[in-house]
């Protein structure tokens, strides 16, 4: 085993019909409710800012974002009506990203998920940790910044300027991670510092080459990816 996750996509493995039955997730443990819910939020946000977004994917992505923000906390705390709505939200997010594709949050989650001896970083947990840092990185691109601000504005978050709206969006994600008991940094998750330093250069190379990187709204080099991972490990500001 290489310790590397590879995303696979092909029409030969695409189902003709999806049965979206909320009864299937009634018994889901709270931790998995949190991780899969934040994965759905990441799917929707990345689809909305993707270079391949369009008029067919934008409404699906925005509706999914709104539903996750509205229903995930209650679903996490055991409300079955909210869990049903989350089940629909993840489907809408899936429809959005299946057509608009994703970005480097997923690239990074794919390539760190099985990389460390500490244990597997569950995909949704990784996405939740990485998302606010990637928003900060991508928001240095004017088009991406406008899209993130649009999300915040439509979700009724505070702010007038784009910068203030983006701050509110990141703060909302941080707030949700706190409520869902998701770590804010890789260090807090428990990744050992010496192993992180040893592996992060090669992980960064792999992440840049991931299939999801091509539709990210801002280009990234292996050196920039390594800097971004360092911000996520130590919880430092993304200022580049």
Tell what function each PLM region has.
Residues 91-127, 210-215:
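Glycine-rich phosphate/pyrophosphate-binding beta-alpha loops
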Residues 115-118, 124-198, 238-239:
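Gly/Pro-rich interdomain helix-loop hinge
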Residues 41-45, 86-94, 108, 131, ...:
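Short alpha-helical scaffolding segments that buttress acidic/His motifs in well-ordered protein cores
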Residues 195-240:
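Short, amphipathic C-terminal "tail helix"
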Residues 61, 83-86, 148, 166, ...:
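Hydrophobic packing residues in well-ordered alpha-helices of helical domains and bundles
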Residues 1-100:
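Carboxylate- and glycine-rich phosphate/diphosphate-binding segment that chelates Mg2+/Mn2+
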Residues 81, 164, 187-190, 215-223:
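Short coil/turn segments at secondary-structure boundaries
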């Amino acid at each position: 085993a290489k310790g590397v996750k590879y995303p696979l996509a092909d029409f030969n493995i695409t189902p003709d019909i999806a049965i979206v039955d909320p009864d299937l997730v009634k018994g889901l443990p709270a931790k998995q409710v949190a991780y899969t819910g934040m994965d759905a939020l990441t799917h929707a946000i990345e689809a909305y800012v993707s270079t391949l977004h369009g008029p067919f994917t934008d409404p699906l992505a925005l509706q999914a974002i709104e539903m996750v923000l509205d229903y995930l906390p209650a679903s996490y705390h055991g409300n079955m009506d909210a869990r049903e709505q989350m089940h629909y939200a993840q489907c809408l997010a899936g429809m959005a990203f299946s057509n608009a594709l994703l970005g480097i949050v997923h690239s990074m989650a794919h390539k760190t998920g099985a990389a460390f001896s500490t244990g597997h970083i569950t995909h949704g947990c990784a996405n939740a940790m990485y998302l606010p840092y990637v928003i900060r990185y991508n928001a240095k691109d004017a088009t991406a910044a406008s899209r993130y601000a649009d999300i915040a504005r439509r979700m009724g978050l505070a702010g007038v300027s784009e910068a203030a709206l983006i701050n509110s969006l990141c703060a909302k994600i941080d707030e949700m991670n706190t409520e869902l008991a998701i770590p804010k940094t890789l260090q807090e998750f428990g990744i050992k510092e010496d192993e992180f330093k040893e592996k992060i250069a090669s992980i960064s190379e792999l992440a840049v080459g991931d299939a999801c990187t091509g539709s990210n709204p801002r280009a990234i080099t292996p050196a920039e990816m390594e800097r971004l991972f360092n911000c996520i490990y130590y919880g430092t500001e993304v200022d580049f």
